[in-house]
Design a protein with these regions (language model features):
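Bacterial Sec-dependent N-terminal signal peptides
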Residues: 1-24
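Active-site mouth of glycoside hydrolases
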Residues: 27-152
Length: 152
């Protein structure tokens, strides 16, 4: 009779202990470009890596990511995309001309003259774009860029 009382207790203990031990394991980030550059297959029908590993483009569309999200929000958004299994995040570099990001920085500070696009001492529009790309890379995500959503 004592054995029958012990079994539910042990099952309860296992039920509580199993998720706790699973949470301690950290998942290693899969870095797809370790397989080489992306290229079109010889048949011209699909994408693959340089070493022949197939690549399936599973994209999330975050068109306004560079304009609307700050660094913390971008980090969170990209982490959520990674957790959901996306491997490409599609963004617009310029939603309109000029584009303005959440920090109030303009994409084209000097019109179409890009020689001085990075202003010294300012976290500019393109610095934020670089941050997004680096953050995505750390998470094993590609960034698919569209130049513009509006007519330039």
């Amino acid at each position: 009779m004592k054995t029958f009382k012990l079994i539910p207790f042990l099952l309860l203990l296992l039920t509580v202990a199993m998720p706790a031990s699973a949470q301690k394991k950290t998942q290693k980030t899969y870095i797809p470009w370790n397989n080489g550059k992306l290229m079109v297959s010889e048949e011209g029908r699909y994408l693959k890596h340089e070493n022949g590993t197939p690549f399936f483009w599973l994209g999330e569309t975050g068109w306004l990511l560079p304009q609307r999200l700050n660094r913390d929000e971008a980090e969170y958004y990209l982490e959520q995309c990674k957790q959901r299994g996306y491997n490409v995040i599609q963004v617009q570099t310029l939603n309109n001309v000029p584009s303005i990001n959440t920090y109030g920085q303009y994409s084209m500070t000097d019109g179409y003259n890009f020689k001085n696009i990075n202003q010294k001492g300012v976290y500019g529009y393109w610095d934020h774009m670089d941050y997004i790309i680096r953050t995505a890379a750390r998470k094993g995500l590609y960034i698919g860029m569209s130049v513009s959503g509006a007519v330039l």
